[in-house]
């Protein structure tokens, strides 16, 4: 649950910032709007990739993949902000979309794999509370952006969240 909440919150922040972040990195309004759509498409792609990876490997490998993609997103955007590279920003947004899209697929596969189909609807409903809890992170990130005047500060927060999720991959045990 904590893992899903952390990973989900990174995606929520990037989705929230995507348009203005693209403009900050030099995209035209038309391109920035298109990039928000690309991020959304990557969300859908993440669901498929995560499902295939889970079915062909295992839970831990899939979680590690999602964690690396999430961390790569924060790092790419931080590098984009430092260098002014729109291309790195686009990469980071695409990775965030893939990561964010992976969470629902990973959650449902994880729940069935660990707890079976019995009470799946209840378990999945509880797992989806990650969106409620994670929704506070964009508010915090927005406050950090406003108080610091730069996107670097909120993306350092996202990098920290991503790094915190790494050891969670190794702490999860079948009940």
Q: PLM features: residue spans?
A:
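Helix-to-loop junctions at the C-terminal end of transmembrane segments
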Residues: 47-58, 145-146
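C-terminal ends and interior cores of transmembrane alpha-helices
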Residues: 69-82
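Cytoplasmic membrane-interface "Motif A"-like loop-to-helix N-cap segments
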Residues: 55-68
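Extracytoplasmic gate region of multi-pass secondary transporters
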Residues: 1-50, 137-141
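A membrane-interface helix-boundary motif in multi-pass transporters
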Residues: 143-161
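A late C-terminal transmembrane helix in Major Facilitator Superfamily
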Residues: 114-148
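Multi-pass alpha-helical transporter architecture, strongest
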Residues: 159-175
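Intracellular juxtamembrane helix-capping segments at the cytosolic ends
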Residues: 102-115
């Amino acid at each position: 649950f904590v893992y899903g909440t952390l990973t989900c919150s990174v995606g929520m922040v990037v989705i929230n910032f995507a348009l203005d972040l693209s403009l900050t990195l030099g995209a035209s309004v038309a391109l920035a709007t298109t990039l928000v759509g690309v991020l959304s498409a990557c969300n859908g792609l993440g669901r498929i990739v995560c499902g295939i990876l889970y079915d062909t490997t295992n839970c831990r490998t899939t979680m590690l993949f999602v964690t690396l993609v999430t961390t790569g997103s924060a790092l790419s955007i931080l590098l984009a902000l430092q260098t002014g590279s729109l291309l790195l920003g686009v990469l980071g947004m695409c990775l965030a979309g893939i990561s964010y899209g992976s969470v629902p697929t990973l959650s449902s596969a994880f729940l069935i794999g660990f707890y079976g189909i019995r009470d799946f609807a209840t378990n999945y409903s509880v797992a989806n509370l990650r969106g409620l809890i994670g929704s506070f992170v964009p508010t915090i990130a927005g406050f950090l952006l406003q108080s610091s005047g730069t996107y670097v500060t909120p993306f350092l927060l996202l990098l920290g969240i991503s790094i915190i999720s790494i050891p969670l991959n190794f702490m999860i045990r079948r009940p």
